[in-house]
Amino acid sequence: MASLKALRNRIASVKSTQKITKAMKMVAAAKLRRAQAQAEAARPYATRMAAMMGALAEGAAENPNAPALLVGNGADRTHLIVVVSADRGLAGPFNASINRAARARARKLEAEGKQVRLFTVGRKGRDFFRRDMREKIIGEANFVGKKTIEFADAEAIANQIIAAFNDGKFDVCTLMFNRFVSVMSQVPSETPLIPASAGQAANDNAGSDQPAGDYEIEPDDGTLLDRLLPRNLAVQIYSALLESAAGEQGARMTAMDNATRNAGEMINRLTLNYNRTRQANITKELIEIISGAEAL
């Protein structure tokens, strides 16, 4: 049986931890409100942008002069997976779920005879893939020390991806991230980046009350696409970063809430054990005193 001093120290330690987890829950809740608002504001723009690029890709499928960023380079040998994770832990299964999903996709592609390359966004994804897929990583990014994610951050990542594509390091690029559904739910999701998915327009417009429509391009296709294609990559990456940020805070708030409640239950059990031990010690001392008095 543990001593009273050990139990008191244990109770004090758990109470201290409970204060920390409660504070982290409150901080995550405050950050979640802003992150959720940003993610929800960016989502329609990214969705319509993807739909437009999908429509353009479908229309340009037979055009031999169509930009490679739009329709691909005609090859399907090397796949780049851009994995978006968090820079910090203590968020339940948030990071593990997207990392495992990306690893499963990589292994599936390899089983099909494809080559896989990785671009990790976030320290948790970087550390995860450095352990067993270090040689496949061609780029890394994180936001350590930054309070907010800016569009310029997404543009920088997009520029690195475009440069790698132009250098022939991959043929197909897919973005993987945790899509924010609710505080309790963050779902690993995929978005095609290169080439633009021709089926994306129909899929996105199926859930939209706005018609797809025909696009009139001015002054000409080349001028517009030269600017629009890199921006589309940046928009999709930026939206994924915001979705992931909101999901991270939701997962952390849930994890810290569970930790706080578990700490409370542990404190109750330890306190009960402490009281029982103290009562047993007092009873033992009384018996010894009474036995000593009877002996006299």
Curated annotation (Swiss-Prot):
It holds the Pfam family ATP-synt. The keyword Aminoacyl-tRNA synthetase does not apply. CDD domains: F1-ATPase_gamma (cd12151). GO terms for biological process: proton motive force-driven plasma membrane ATP synthesis. It is a peripheral membrane protein. GO terms for cellular component: plasma membrane; proton-transporting ATP synthase complex. SUPFAM superfamilies: ATP synthase (F1-ATPase), gamma subunit. It is found in: Cell inner membrane. Belongs to the ATPase gamma chain family. NCBIfam families: ATPsyn_F1gamma, PRK05621.1-4. This is ATP synthase gamma chain. The lineage of its organism: Bacteria, Pseudomonadati, Pseudomonadota, Alphaproteobacteria, Acetobacterales.
